């Protein structure tokens, strides 16, 4: 089998296609979570804490060149090392929300799977069948 046909067989398996669909949907869902965090949650947290924009919370680790604006983007473009803890906080909140949503989805899936009834055991054979089997086994042991 050639390498190309092996790859085609591998790529067309159901699991690989399911994984690809999952990755694409996950990427789109990640954008939704980013928007929820950046546009809805972080402004509320920023309002409570007193800073409206977490993305501009940083500490410079070196002296910036004279005349450089004190914004995160300008300092990064100027090559000034910065400790951007506000951006990190936003990413951590993103992760926690995404992990919680995935937890809820897995929990719901497990509940649905647990609710499926297990296949019932077959009922025991009637007593007359049991007696007939015992008689049959007894006759087998008596024959020479």
Curated annotation (Swiss-Prot):
GO MF terms held by the record: mechanosensitive monoatomic ion channel activity
Function (record text): Channel that opens in response to stretch forces in the membrane lipid bilayer. May participate in the regulation of osmotic pressure changes within the cell.
Places the protein is found: Cell inner membrane
Subunit structure: Homopentamer.
Topological category with respect to the lipid bilayer: Multi-pass membrane protein
The gene coding this protein: mscL
UniProt entry keywords in alphabetical sequence: Cell inner membrane, Cell membrane, Ion channel, Ion transport, Membrane, Transmembrane, Transmembrane helix, Transport
Species classification: Bacteria, Pseudomonadati, Pseudomonadota, Betaproteobacteria, Burkholderiales
Transmembrane segments: 16-36, 86-106
GO CC terms, sorted: plasma membrane
Domain of life, per lineage: Bacteria
Signal peptide span: none
Glycosyltransferase recorded as keyword: no
Family the UniProt entry places it in: Belongs to the MscL family.
Name the UniProt record assigns to this protein: Large-conductance mechanosensitive channel
InterPro entries listed in its UniProt record: Mechanosensitive_channel_CS, MS_channel, MSC/AndL, MscL_channel
PROSITE patterns: MSCL
């Amino acid at each position: 089998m050639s390498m190309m046909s092996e790859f085609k067989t591998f790529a067309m398996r159901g699991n690989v296609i399911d994984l690809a669909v999952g990755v694409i949907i996950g990427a789109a869902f990640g954008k939704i979570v980013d928007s929820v965090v950046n546009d809805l949650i972080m402004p509320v947290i920023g309002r409570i804490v007193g800073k409206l924009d977490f993305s501009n919370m940083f500490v410079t680790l070196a002296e910036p060149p004279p005349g450089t604006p004190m914004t995160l983007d300008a300092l990064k473009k100027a090559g000034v090392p910065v400790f951007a803890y506000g951006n990190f906080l936003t990413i951590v909140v993103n992760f926690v929300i995404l992990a919680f949503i995935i937890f809820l989805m897995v929990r719901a899936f497990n509940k649905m799977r647990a609710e499926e009834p297990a296949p019932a055991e077959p009922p025991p054979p009637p007593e007359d069948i049991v007696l007939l089997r015992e008689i049959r086994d007894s006759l087998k042991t008596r024959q020479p």
